[in-house]
From Swiss-Prot:
Keywords (A to Z) from UniProt: Cytoplasm, Schiff base, Thiamine biosynthesis, Transferase
Keyword Transferase: yes
Pathway info: Cofactor biosynthesis; thiamine diphosphate biosynthesis
Function, as annotated: Catalyzes the rearrangement of 1-deoxy-D-xylulose 5-phosphate (DXP) to produce the thiazole phosphate moiety of thiamine. Sulfur is provided by the thiocarboxylate moiety of the carrier protein ThiS. In vitro, sulfur can be provided by H(2)S.
Catalytic residues in the record: K95
Name used for this protein in its record: Thiazole synthase
Protein family membership: Belongs to the ThiG family.
Subunit-structure text: Homotetramer. Forms heterodimers with either ThiH or ThiS.
């Protein structure tokens, strides 16, 4: 069971809504993933009507919505988008995204921290997408963010946990949930994230662009379950030396 702010989730897999070939395929994949929290970019949704092609099927599916501020380049733009989302969707949950460079889509740490502090004060449950910077993640936690979402690699790159060493520090020092977001390309990446101590992962591109998004969503669901179970089982520690699994000389001594 995963708890973030006032919500609890059975699934440790969060999903996105971008890049799917159709809304129907998106919903089928989300259902197959078992995800209970789905993020959607406010710039892609018609907030004036709930029969929007993306919004309507998500509401019908009964998943919790996590609007994001993707496209915002400054704290001010993100705060504006957050208020639009809260008014239109009736949720104070927000995935805070601020990336000024459209080529790399890397989060702006200064603007993110500034916006997070303001939004928390305004009553939002803030989950910030951020770089894998242990100092920044701690600062975001200190200003009241409900979780932190450090990247594994650039958005949509499918490179996996390129920031693993920093993620381990973030996980070790965090007192709020850590959700690894961005760069997860195959189910084994998700397993690794949960094994190392992450509370959840957010996956979009790897599912949406797969030849079979529904089966890929199932694979990610199982991968997250495997990673969590492995961690809870208490894996053995790593060693630089070999350790025999059975006596090396006992049978020789017995036959002497």
């Amino acid at each position: 069971m995963l708890r973030i702010a006032d919500k609890t989730f059975d699934s440790h897999l969060f999903t996105g809504t971008g890049k799917f070939a159709s809304s129907q395929l998106m919903v089928e994949a989300i259902r197959a993933s078992g995800s209970q929290l789905v993020t959607l970019a406010m710039k892609r949704v018609d907030l004036r009507q709930h029969n929007d092609a993306i919004l309507e099927p998500l509401i019908a599916a009964g998943v919790a919505l996590l609007p994001n501020t993707s496209g915002a380049k400054t704290a001010e733009e993100a705060i504006f988008a957050a208020h639009l989302a809260r008014e239109a969707l009736g949720t104070n949950w927000l995935k805070l995204e601020i990336h000024p460079d459209a080529r790399w889509l890397l989060p702006d740490p200064i603007e993110t921290l500034k916006a997070a502090e303001t939004l928390v004060q305004q009553g939002f449950v803030v989950l910030p997408y951020c770089g894998a910077d242990p100092v920044l993640c701690k600062r975001l936690e200190e200003v009241g963010c409900a979780a932190v979402m450090p990247l594994g690699a650039p958005i949509g790159s499918n490179q996996g946990l390129e920031t693993r060493a920093m993620l381990e520090i973030i996980i070790q020092q965090a007192t709020v949930p850590v959700v690894v977001d961005a760069g997860i390309g195959v189910p084994s990446h998700a397993t690794q994230a949960l094994e190392m101590g992450a509370d959840a992962v957010l996956v979009n591109t790897a599912i949406a662009v797969a030849d079979d998004p529904v089966n890929m969503a199932k694979a990610f669901r199982l991968a997250v379950e495997v990673g969590l179970l492995a961690r809870q089982s208490g894996p053995g520690s790593r060693s630089y030396f070999a350790h025999a699994t059975s006596p090396l000389t006992g049978f020789l001594e017995a036959s002497a």
